[in-house]
């Protein structure tokens, strides 16, 4: 690897990690589980798919689409059933890859790709409005003006910095710069600590504490199948998008196998399920990331 490529990948990876952590915590809260489960899942899935997957430059982690799928299971049956579901869902993904079904993504029409990407962009944009609320009420007065000012300043950095220099990713400069500004001026803004209490150690290997019988299988199987289908679809469409952006071709079957193994590992170590994340992938590619 050339030094310039290594530098670009390191900076892009740092940028993506800053964006990935709060998102995975937020998705864990959506799924009504401990935020640590989101962090465990993000680390395990991102690491394994990066090392063994078939699409360099693509970012995977504990995704929001997976959180929405399994929230009802968590509410009704608890976290241990979620871990078993992640295990089974990973097994389905693994089988999908081993059967070489990933290449079917090449048959998806381009308009579907456009609809997928733009639909996710709208969802991501709409999701930002909740940050303009506090305790169910819209921000007003100084708090609102401060939020709007920081958002505008962040967008200006991302938009204008590439016109001055491309030595560093603009998203990384915006995150670090605005973070430092808020800290130095002691501005009254919300932090990750306000979203949830995050404390704990490293994950440990343990089987889900559930009765291993057909009744349990009947409970988790529908969620596992749905989780696998949603995860595979989002992953393969993101892989297709990455192919278009980089003008290279990935290996969808290999990515499916790696994603399945990653989800099974996450389930064994107490993490959430996950798949490719289009938002983080676009940030990574836009920051110059092309490698693993």
Task: Specify the residue positions occupied by each region the protein language model found.
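Transmembrane helical cores of multi-pass ion-transport proteins
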Residues: 1-292
């Amino acid at each position: 690897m050339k030094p310039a490529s290594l530098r670009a990948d390191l900076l892009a990876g740092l940028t993506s990690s800053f964006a990935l952590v709060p998102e995975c915590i937020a998705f864990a809260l959506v799924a009504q589980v401990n935020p640590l489960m989101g962090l465990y899942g993000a680390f395990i899935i991102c690491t394994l798919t990066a090392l063994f997957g078939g699409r360099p430059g693509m970012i995977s982690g504990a995704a929001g689409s997976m959180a929405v799928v399994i929230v009802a299971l968590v509410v009704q049956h608890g976290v241990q059933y979620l871990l078993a579901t992640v295990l089974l869902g990973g097994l389905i993904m693994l089988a999908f890859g081993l059967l070489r079904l990933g290449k079917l993504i090449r048959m998806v029409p381009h308009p579907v790709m456009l609809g997928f990407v733009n639909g996710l962009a709208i969802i991501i944009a709409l999701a930002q409005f909740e940050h303009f609320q506090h305790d169910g009420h819209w921000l007003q007065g100084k708090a609102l003006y401060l939020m709007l000012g920081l958002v505008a300043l962040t967008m200006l950095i991302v938009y204008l910095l590439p016109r001055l220099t491309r030595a560093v990713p603009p998203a990384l400069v915006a995150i670090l710069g605005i973070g430092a500004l808020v800290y130095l001026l002691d501005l009254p803004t919300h932090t990750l600590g306000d979203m949830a209490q995050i404390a704990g150690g490293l994950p440990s290997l343990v089987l889900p504490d559930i009765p291993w019988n057909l009744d349990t299988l009947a409970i988790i199987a529908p969620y596992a199948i749905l989780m696998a289908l949603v995860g595979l679809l989002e992953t393969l469409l993101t892989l297709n998008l990455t192919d278009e952006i980089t003008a290279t071709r990935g290996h969808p079957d290999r990515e499916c196998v790696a994603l399945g193994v990653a989800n099974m590992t996450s389930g064994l170590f107490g993490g959430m399920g996950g798949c490719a994340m289009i938002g983080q992938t676009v940030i990574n590619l836009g920051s110059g990331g092309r490698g693993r």
